[in-house]
Amino acid sequence: MLKRRFPAVAPEFNLTLRMNILDPTPVRSHVVTTDVEACDVLVIGGGPAGSTAAALLAQQGRKVVLLEKAHHPRFHIGESLLPANVALFDRLGLREQIEAIGMPKYGVEFVSPDHDHTVALEFSEAWDKSMPYAWQVRRSEMDEMLFRNATAHGADTREGWRVRNVDFDADGATVQATHDDGEKRTWRARFVIDASGRDTFLSNKFKAKQKNPKHNSSALFGHFANALRGEGKLEGNITIFWFAHGWFWYIPLADGTTSIGAVCWPHYLKSRTKPVKDFFADTIALCPQLVERLKDATLVDDAVYATGNYSYTSTHCSGERYLMLGDAFTFVDPVFSSGVYLAMHSAFESVDVVTAALERPAQAAALMQRFERYMRKGPREFSWFIFRVTNPTMREFFMYPQNPMRVKEALMSLLAGDIYGKTPIWRSLRIIKTMYWLVSAGHPRRTWLAWTRRRRNIRDLGPLVGENVVDAK
């Protein structure tokens, strides 16, 4: 049973970075501060990874500077969290605050155009039953909460500062940044953490960024009011709708709005010949089940946005005086909502590496090698399923879930983000993969057509350009 959720107040939806608050002091133009400020760690980017790392390191008594190019609250896509996030918010002391702003998310619903039923999977069905839910959140609220938490723990947090250059030497790094009022400053840091997200600051600097050869996708997205929702416990579940050119996310938020996006093949988005809002409407029309849920819905702020170049990685994520965290290192696809979890968990893992680099240099190299392996593990485990999520064989697995040899429990553990602990899911996940190959081999024509179509669809067609295009880096 679906119900309609009305927002109590008209929600704001502004993809551009929030305008600076008016300041009665005169605007400075091209002011250069000659003093060089010293710090132990300079963090680039005040999103989930950067703010978490800054808070944890400041708690240790480190002198931490956190530079965020925007001003919180600022919009960011990626509003769905995983149950594995809950423990991280506990460790940060922020669980109650997240509970207050989040919509409880107990599972995921799958809707296929080729099946006459839907499937709802709950996180309580995972191998470890102790992580039964997560939240859907407005990232503007959550990211600001994490940023202010870093401030509260002693980090020197600054907004409106864009890092322009980082020069490394044997003792650390010289970091130059510009404020959005024109002021320029220089910091001398013993260690640098790049948490710049899709700006991939250090990866670009070292020419380490690589397009993912196995995946390529683009997205259209907007927020809707008055969209239909599930009843009771099902209200906050994310829904994945497959359609001819990819899949849709459907994320109910606590204020009554619903975040909806189409993740599609680049060639489909590049075929657009009309305004992005109209193209999004045409795309939604390709999914009748989604059309039904939006029959009385209205687009918030009349705004739809597009983003391209979703998938990339980097050749490395660590160096003698730096680390790359979260999306600053790699990003694959948002289908399993893994981005925020991987970013925050990488911040927790970074603490021991930074501590060794600053205090026990002889141990740092081994810890950095371990960190490199860790940073590749999460995206690798999710990617195997992400690369195949639009394949008809994988779609059958999701639409007819079975649990022989605990394969369903293992899959739900993966979807919950339970990939770094001691939960023994790996044998069952290997069984899923074996079953996938056997079923695919049993349908050679279907498998061949799906493979050739995917190879054609993931071709690199160049950067996405046009109106309302964001993060096209």
Where are these regions (language model features)?
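Extreme N-terminal leader/targeting segments of oxidoreductases
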Residues: 6, 13-41, 56-60, 458-473
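Glycine-rich FAD pyrophosphate-binding loop
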Residues: 58-77
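Predominantly flavin-linked oxidoreductase catalytic cores and closely associated redox partners
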Residues: 149-290
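C-terminal helical "tail/cap" subdomain of flavin- and related membrane-associated enzymes
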Residues: 355-473
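FAD/FMN-dependent oxidoreductases across multiple families
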Residues: 101, 268-353, 359-370, 377
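N-terminal FAD cofactor-binding segment of flavoenzymes
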Residues: 76-115
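Short beta-strand to alpha-helix junction loop
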Residues: 127-148, 270-275
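Glycine-rich Rossmann-fold phosphate-binding loop(s) that bind the pyrophosphate
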Residues: 45-47
